[in-house]
From Swiss-Prot:
SUPFAM superfamilies: DNA helicase RuvA subunit, C-terminal domain (SSF46929), Nucleic acid-binding proteins (SSF50249), RuvA domain 2-like (SSF47781). GO terms for biological process: DNA recombination; DNA repair. Gene3D superfamilies: 5' to 3' exonuclease, C-terminal subdomain (1.10.150.20), DNA helicase RuvA subunit, C-terminal domain (1.10.8.10), Nucleic acid-binding proteins (2.40.50.140). This is Holliday junction branch migration complex subunit RuvA. Transmembrane segments: none annotated. Residues 159-212 are annotated as: Domain III. It comes from Rhodospirillum rubrum (strain ATCC 11170 / ATH 1.1.1 / DSM 467 / LMG 4362 / NCIMB 8255 / S1).
Amino acid sequence: MIAKLKGLVDSVAEDHAVIDVGGVGYLVFCPARVLTRLPSPGQAVALVVETQVREDHISLFGFLETAERDWFRLLSTVQGVGSKVALSVLSVLSAGQISQAIAAGDKAALGRAPGVGPKLAARIASELKDKAVALGGMPAPPPRGAGTDAAGEGPPGGPTGDVLGDAVSALVNLGYGRSEAVGAASRAAGLGATTVQGVIGLALRDLGRGGA
């Protein structure tokens, strides 16, 4: 099984690249986000590779980051998601954005990928939610009032569910996607923000830098 290719970019097409490794050209299917980041032909490149062996052919799928390869594998485990759809998702969302979208249940973000309809987006979000959190996605904020004690106070040192929920709602109203709003608000809370204004302020700064 081929797990990595290190060589020279020979050519780049719409859905694949040919990598020259010691005079042998390997055709590697890649997400569009990867293809646009490859160096010019003749330049060195290293790709993390997933090898799929079928009865009549062997296919190589290449990625610049291990996290991209890991998400390709996970997406491919969902019924209705083949290699083509998995590449489609990774073409419109980075590995981090996929984690955030699934952890937040943001089916609209997943549905931006060609071939992913509402039902398939819901299935992906449902089946991979736990894995998304494990891979760095931030879970959606708890429902309003959740996680508070009898006095209505949140856990020491952190914002209440009401605060996170209100901050996320405000960010969404400003035009940000729910998944990126959840991620930015959660990171703001991790930096010590405990009020709606504090969370929004840090989150907007985070979003202005393009997120984590």
